[in-house]
Amino acid sequence: MIIKADLHMHTCLSPCGDDDMTPYNAVNLAKLLGYDMIAVTDHNSCLNCPAAVRLVVVPGMELCTAEEIHNVCLFPSLDAAKEFSDFVYDKMPDIINRPEIFGEQIITDEKDNIIGYEKRLLTVASDITEGETVKAVSSYGGVCFPAHIDRSSYSLLS
């Protein structure tokens, strides 16, 4: 059996995401393109995962480690992802987002209604090391892998 999947997808919650990149739009585009599965992996957060459950959606996040390596972290359930997200939030610097510079970090429901804005800047490195990431993700029943292997920044080899 062949499954067409995208396991590294951002929504409007991520600072790099456009405001039109809502979970609803991501799911519908994935359906139009014939995907069977997607993983919503916003930067250091899983707050938009609940809004994207109409396709097989793997809850996850793209975690920026203390070494500034980006890892895709995937979890078996939304509850596990939320618990890991709480763990990550405790390990992030308390820097307030500046929407005029980084854009809004939008949280939506499954119908794309805006239900909030993340105030803490999500594009910063956490205090979690690469080694701690693997152990922590595993403790929540998840798996992780490098989001970028050989890029000029935020990758395993840079």
Residue ranges and their predicted role:
Residues 1-67:
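An N-terminally biased module of ancient metal coordination in phosphate/nucleic-acid-related enzymes
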Residues 2, 54-158:
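Extended substrate/RNA-proximal surfaces in nucleic-acid metabolism proteins
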